[in-house]
Amino acid sequence: MRRFLTVQFALLALLVLAVPANASTLGQRVLEKGDRGDDVVTLQRILGMKGYSVGGADGVFGRRTKVAVKRFQRRRHLKADGRVGPATTRALARTWGVRTATYYGPGLYGNRTACGFTLRHRTRGVAHRSLPCGTRVPVYRNGLIAIFPVIDRGPHTSGVQLDLTHAAARKLGMRTTSAVRAGY
């Protein structure tokens, strides 16, 4: 019986260690080699957009991701330690244009978007006047970066360049019309 419990405990520990940490928004934690999760996927996609090869966005911060991060850090005159903290996260978005963004959603849930999606409470995406439907748009605000697909047309307010769904705005901590950096 004791051996059986020891084996069960070992299997449980293995499962717990194998489950990736799932901080889904880049900037919620410091990333380093060995980390896993959706935030690592976001990092890998952004590095790829900037021309740094990571071998694909698999969500595992491995050797190739660390090498790409260090190259990026050196080119931006940051401490090249291969870790992604607030300074590196800011630097990733620094070259993106500053845009005025607002959000939409409440009162429109259940309606179809211009790109064929049904808008729901948890739908994360952006509305843009001309980017093709499905284009991934990285957005930076409050030290956080997330990538959202274009799912609708808009915004329909003068002086606003980007419209986030309510769920996308919440993910970035946005509560009012705000300045964001967007990589398009």
Describe each model-derived feature in a short phrase.
Residues 11, 47, 72, 76, ...:
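Alpha-helix boundary/capping residues
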Residues 12, 29-32, 78, 123, ...:
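Generic anion/oxyanion-binding catalytic loop in active/binding sites
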Residues 30-90:
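Short acidic, glycine/serine/threonine-rich helix-capping segments at coil-helix boundaries
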